Structure formats: C-alpha cells, structure tokens
Amino acid sequence: MKKCFILLLSVCCIISSCGNLSEKEIEETTSTGVVLVQNQSYYEVVLSNGESLYFSGFDEEGDLTGITTDKDSVELVTNYGTGFFISQEGEIATNFHVVSNTVADKEVNKSINKVISALKKVIVAIYNDYNEKLERAQLAYDYANQSPEISYEDFYKVRDIRDAIQKEMEEYAQYYNSLDDIRASDSEIKYHNEVSIAYNNTFVTNTNDFVSCVITKSDQEHDLAIIQLKDKKTPSDKYVFPIDDEDPLETYSWKDEIEKKIKEDKNSKLFMSSFNLGPKLAITKEGIKSQFNNGNISQKTNDRLMYSIPTLPGSSGSPVVNLQGQLVAINFAGLNGTQNFNYGIRVKHLRNLVNK
C-alpha cells in the first residue's frame, strides 16, 4: 500500500513538473516572440520601349490603381500580418502572402495591356486639358496681335506660352501613338516591396519605428515565408518558438499520455497571439499589443488544421500553440462568411522550409 502511494505521488510530481501550462503562462511566455509585420509595395511596368510606368496595385475588379509615370509619386500600398521568431539569428516565420506578391504571374502579365489602356486614357485626358488651354492661349494671342495696347514684350510672352502648349500637345500625341507599338509580350511587370517588423509591447507612431527585414526563404505552395532582421540578431528579451522534430499533434510522450488520462490532452485546446487588423487594434497607450485567443481543433488534414480560434485580417502568420506551448500550426486563412473557423498550416511544412 505504501509503495503504491509513493508510486502515485511520484507520478503526480512528474506530471505537475512538466505538464500542461496555464493560459496565462502560455500568453506571457509566447507574446514576446510575436511581431507585427508590415509590407509596403508597388508595381513597376517595364515597357518594351524601355520606359517604365508605376502603379499601386489592383482594385476588387482587377483594374489598376494609382498609375503614374513618376516613380517618386507612386503611392505605396501597406498591408499587415503577424510573424514570430524561430531562431536566435533574427529569423521570423510568417505567411508568404503577407510579404510577397499575391497576384499570380499570369494574371499580372495580363495587366500589361490594362496598363497601356489605362495610360492611353490618362494621356487623352491630359491632351484634352491642354487643348482647352491652347484655345484660351490662342484667343489671348489673337487679341495681343491685334491690340495696339499690348507691348511687343507682352505679345512675345503670350506667343511663347501658346507655342509651349502646342509643343506639349504634340509630345503627348506622339507618346499616345507610340503606345500602339508597345508589345505586351516583351514588357514586364515587377513587384517591389519593403518588409519590416515592429516588436510587441513597443511604441509605433510611423513607419520609421519598424525594423527592416529581408525575405530569405519561401514556400508559396504552403503559404509560408521566413524573413530575417538585417543584423541577424534576435533581441535577447524575445521568445523564440521551438520547432519540434516531430509533430506535437501526433506525438505523445509517456508523460503526455499520463496527463491525457488524468488531466487534459495537450492538444485539447489551442492558443494564438496575433495582430488582428494590424495596428488598428494593436495600438494602445502602452504601445502595440497582440491579441491572445483560444479555441479547439475542428478538423485535421495532412497539410492543414481547422480550429475555432476567432481571427480578423492581420492575423495571417500567427503562431498556433497547444497547452504545452508547442508550435502546431501557422495561421493563414479563415472560412468565408465567418471569423470563428480558421485554418493553419501544420508545423511540419515550416520545419521543412527551415531545413530547406
């Protein structure tokens, strides 16, 4: 009897020393390793004649937005997601779509004709505007030419203005005609972007408060990417998420099996730290703060995990952990029409990317 009691006591001690964590412990431990990811981007169209055009992106109908011929005036599109540290060398895991072009190459290439068409419309509008200016300038010229009250100096000024407008119109007309000679097949659309991160529990007031990163690895098929701080150093006070060699959803140690029977399955509940809606919800008087939510597994496939953790846009790339704080998935998508059933990419694909 005494031996049984001692054995039971020993088992209880083992379980209590290395079992499941409390929700508070999980949040406090993992939240420092979560970062807000910012992606600022624009597109460049290199035409077959060697000239470049720029635009911000695509609207819901697939049309171009913010088209311009001036690189310095192109409006950057800013999107946000979530990431988390996976090494001491400043490596951060997130979703591919958070840090890269989300439009398929074939769809982008189709847009070259749209670019040319949109540019023609812009040129026509500018040409018509100059035509109205020319009509007014011609009236002023005719008046100056016939009026004895106008000095020769003022007359020449009016003439020069009219001639300058005519020259501009001729150049725009030539440019318009030259667009017909541009071959879409020989033109190219390039995606330009800058990726940066902000640390959880820090103050962010503008883009200068973000730390620049580079994209080092990507897996478009599984929507995963690894970015890295340029100095390749993870701050000492940031939590680094371990990536287990074996899937925690499938692998149970003998201690896990005992806890599963006596207390609770380590995978019975999942937790996620994320930046829902980017900085909109994250900004507080104490700095930006991630949101911590939990839910249950609804479905498992070989590649994905569906769970009931509520999310909003901006949570893409968030770490999903179990009751022991083990990384089991990377959040990437929600079901249409609901925010309470979401999908994550199983951690094995991140492990494969890290080892790539």
Predicted regions and their residues:
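Sec-dependent N-terminal signal peptides
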Residues: 4-14
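C-terminal cap/linker of serine protease catalytic domains
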Residues: 100-182, 328-356
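N-terminal activation segment of mature serine protease catalytic domains
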Residues: 18-96, 179-182, 186-200, 207-216, ...
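Catalytic nucleophile loop of clan PA
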Residues: 84-85, 310-331
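Short, solvent-exposed secondary-structure boundary/capping segments
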Residues: 223-228, 304-310
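Flexible, gly/ser-rich surface segments that form the specificity/activation loops bordering the active-site cleft
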Residues: 22-23, 78, 205-208, 214-216, ...
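Positively charged n-region of N-terminal signal peptides that target proteins for export
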Residues: 1-4, 83
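Conserved active-site neighborhood of the chymotrypsin/trypsin-like protease fold
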Residues: 20, 90-104, 137-144, 150, ...
